[in-house]
């Protein structure tokens, strides 16, 4: 596991936060810095067919070291970090041999507590890498990046049989654009794994169907003293819309396979208001029903408005549940599960209450379930990763490569 932690700490030192609402891909210059660094490291490692596209997708190949009809497989991670929390001047803390209890994050009042995050009870004796309470850590997904790079080094430096190993590093995954410019044909893998999961053992092949809902409300503002019968308050209409959305079907009230409506932002004045929702559901029929529900609500609240006042609703699908594509190729999951068991890890098949690049790639002809990274509490100041979890991820990647080679020989 030479240089695994060193690589990770180097990668998180670079601010690669992506930005939503930007046309260019990658959306931020910082992502280019990490992509160019990785390209240089791949070249130094001796990989071939290294390309960095104008849209920031970095691809490379570790050639097979054995003969046979061995399928080419891929491993993919994203270089950007979430726009939800600052990724600038990340200052990681290394807690060796965690003994339990609260971990102070920096010099302020912030702590990482097992009361709020009970998973810490399972990590006694391990080495934790945390934030200083001022930024996110960036384990999502620089842990995955470091693990893939380290696995390549292990495969390159040891006589472990493997076929062609394709790797890719993508930008803007956190803003939903990571896979849009991914050339599956150029990548050349029969299947792949994103390394973008959470705790040790996670193996995910089901994710939400996802859509965004943007609502524009145009009202009419006049002096409140003479407003009767004339004023149309856009903010009041927004409140009425949200009151119609099922309150018990929100992120904070759902879990497992339950879907939700999430009001992500709302702004406005009496004259004009905007609302942004996201819709999520694992079941395609329920997903379509949720979209219809939003349209019905907008129609109901907007009924009888003055012609100059209106509610405009735009729904855009973001990605779909990759399950229907991955289950067509059960050996992809079988190999990953066997690799975990061979590394003394119990596979934990669970749905992703979110999405990955792999969801989009699966519908582009590259079946792509998701492997764990050893990270927790993504997108915020309580994010952390365990060194042991990262080492396990490297072992699983290497073992997947070895098992795939055995199938083809």
Swiss-Prot record:
Location in or out of the cell: Cytoplasm
Question: What's one GO BP annotation on this UniProt entry?
Answer: proteolysis
Q: Where does Zn(2+) 2 bind?
A: 140, 174, 379
What cofactors does the UniProt entry give for this protein? Zn(2+)
Q: What is its EC number?
A: 3.4.11.4
Q: Mind listing the UniProt keywords for this protein, alphabetically?
A: Aminopeptidase, Cytoplasm, Hydrolase, Metal-binding, Metalloprotease, Protease, Zinc
Which HAMAP family does the record match to this protein? Aminopeptidase_M20
UniProt function note: Cleaves the N-terminal amino acid of tripeptides.
The family note in this entry says: Belongs to the peptidase M20B family.
Q: Which protein are we looking at?
A: Peptidase T
Organism field:
Salmonella dublin (strain CT_02021853)
User: Species lineage, top-down?
Assistant: Bacteria, Pseudomonadati, Pseudomonadota, Gammaproteobacteria, Enterobacterales
Query: What gene is this protein translated from?
Result: pepT
